[in-house]
Amino acid sequence: MVNEIDSESLSQRLADTEDVLLVDIRTPAEIAQGMIPDALQLPMHLIPIRMSEIPKDRDVVIYCRSGARSYQACAYLMQQGYGRVLNLRGGIIAWARHGLPIVAPEG
């Protein structure tokens, strides 16, 4: 079973400067529409070859557009031995719906 976090809880953890890594697994075209500040851009299909960029010793919140792909990514990472991954319930849609910050990607 995949652990999840909602937008409000994640926002509070980030405001409290907790050590949380955000990973945006959407496509570059989706990311171009905006992303959660300070998220690592790691398209879902690249996770198996870039897994070393995801730490096992801190909480990692994975998100996509609606939460479905990120749920699958969390399940995959858990199978690979990652115990501290969380799915952002509702994805960036829920994040935006709550009026939380979205920024343009760098570069």
From Swiss-Prot:
Pathway: Energy metabolism; sulfur metabolism. GO terms for molecular function: transferase activity. It is an enzyme of class 2 (transferase). InterPro entries: GlpE_sulfurtransferase, Rhodanese-like_dom, Rhodanese-like_dom_sf. Disruption phenotype: A mutant strain lacking rhd_2599, tusA and dsrE2, although not viable in liquid culture, is clearly sulfur oxidation negative upon growth on solid media containing sulfide, and shows massive accumulation of intercellular sulfur globules. GO terms for cellular component: cytoplasm. Keywords: Cytoplasm, Transferase. Its EC number is 2.8.1.-. The active site is at C64 (cysteine persulfide intermediate). GO terms for biological process: sulfur compound metabolic process. Induction: Up-regulated under sulfur-oxidizing conditions (at mRNA level), i.e. when grown on reduced sulfur compounds such as sulfide, thiosulfate or elemental sulfur. Pfam families: Rhodanese (PF00581). Signal peptide: none annotated. CDD domains: RHOD. Residues 16-104 form the Rhodanese domain. It is found in: Cytoplasm. Changing C64S: Loss of sulfur binding in the presence of thiosulfate. Sulfur carrier protein involved in sulfur trafficking for oxidative dissimilatory sulfur metabolism. Component of a sulfur relay system that starts with the sulfur-mobilizing rhodanese-like protein Rhd_2599 (Alvin_2599), which transfers the sulfur from a low-molecular-weight thiol, maybe glutathione, to the TusA protein (Alvin_2600); TusA serves as the sulfur donor for DsrEFH, which persulfurates DsrC; persulfurated DsrC very probably serves as a direct substrate for reverse-acting sulfite reductase, DsrAB. Monomer. This is Sulfurtransferase Alvin_2599. The gene is rhd_2599.
